[in-house]
Amino acid sequence: DVNFDLIRELPINLLFDNTSYASILTGVYPDLTSQFLECESHKKLEGYVVIQRTFRYRNHFINYDFLNNYKKLLFIGIESEYDDLKKTVKNLEFYDCLDFVEMSEIIKSSKFTLGNSSLAFPIAEGLNVPRLLEACPYFPAAQPHGKNAFNFYFQNQFEKLFKYLYNL
């Protein structure tokens, strides 16, 4: 057993959010290139590009406006973050998840998941669905692992990888 309360007492940086970092604390070393979470598929929301973009850890080198050329874009997360992205991506839809289980079901049922360093991305990693990480230049701790798992710093990378995953 792992006493996760001990994490609060250790002199470690809890801001480091790479999934593999948990292995140092737990002594458990899963194959991060394989699926290590399970859930059901969502019954109603399938085939969307699922987006979660928090205000924290944004990459200010990129712009989401090209997403207006794509369909079935679904934002999950906080409504104020949705409202902010909706100013740029006019065809973006919002869904307020009931809980993290439903969020996982939606991610599992997605065409792929796009996000910055937030809860949705590690869930997508665990479910091993296609995923795209908006890497944060000033805090590049989160890293994708495995097949069809990418990150980007620059606009041309973002657009190329988005198109690739959209057409899988």
Region locations from a protein language model:
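Catalytic machinery of carbohydrate-active enzymes
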Residues: D1-L168
